[in-house]
Amino acid sequence: FSFFRNTWSKESTIITLHNLYLQTIGTLWKAQTECYRKLQDRPDRSNEAKMVKDAMPVVIIEGICRPHCSHAAANLEKMSRLAMYDLDHLNERTSAVKALFRALPYVAYTQTSISDRGLKVVVFLDARTPEEYPLAYAICQQTLERIAGHPCDEQCARITQPCSCVWDADAYYNPTPEPYPWREELDTDPSLTNLIKDKRNLPGSNGTPYATSNGSSSPFPPATEACGYIETFARNFTHYHPWQKGNRHESMLAMGRSARRKG
């Protein structure tokens, strides 16, 4: 799968899950991880904490992105058959839930989040196309949430959602995971397709598929060079400059200045 030096980069290399594990348990990202954890609870230094996190390398667990392109979903050109789940705010339950997931045959990897309060979990999902990925992801998510007794972050259901690298000496790696049996579960209970329909009907979601060049449909828009960059830019801008009622013009001017600095 793809490895980017930070969330803004359009230059990626290919890394294996085993290599990610070795770098995670080593000291490569230890200093940045400890720095973020010291800053995250200080309101006067929240911007510094955000900058430390944004500067961390990220991986796109779901596969390989096109060369010299962002990690936007439309730039995914080869599937890894893996999927990443994020359980935030586990807090004191983090270690216990990590132990639960280590016992599951389809879990390939776990790491503690950079916040030290949640988990990133990689599952051998065996989804072979972007079109079948959302349903496979949702079926497995339901199982993980039941086992953990805790919800997964819905934002990470988006294919190619970047996963921040981190230092975790207690990370877990399973070199021979079994595929999660989502196809068998779907055959047994066809109503599981409603998991996707329900998500598409949420406020702000768009359930309309996009046409592809071969006449089929896809849940992802056509590839553009800018889409991943723009999404990341907007998310980071609103973090540093929260929207305030009555300040529309000032916010637009600030966004324009920030965009010019980014080139």
Task: Indicate where each model-derived feature is located.
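DNA replication initiation on ssDNA origins
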Residues: F1-R81, K197-N201, S205-N206, E225
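Catalytic "initiation/cleavage/transfer" segments centered on a nucleophilic residue
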Residues: F3, A127, I147-K199
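Positively charged, structured surface patches that bind polyanionic biopolymers
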Residues: C35-Y36, D41, A73, E92, ...
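Modules that initiate DNA replication and primer synthesis
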Residues: D44, A74, K78-R102, I114-T143, ...
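Hydrophobic residues at beta-strand termini and immediately following loops
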Residues: Y85, T110, C165
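A common structural junction motif
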Residues: P105-V107, Q141-H150
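Beta-sheet entry/capping signal
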Residues: A108-Y109, G118-K120, P162
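Short beta-strand
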Residues: Y109-S115, D153-R158
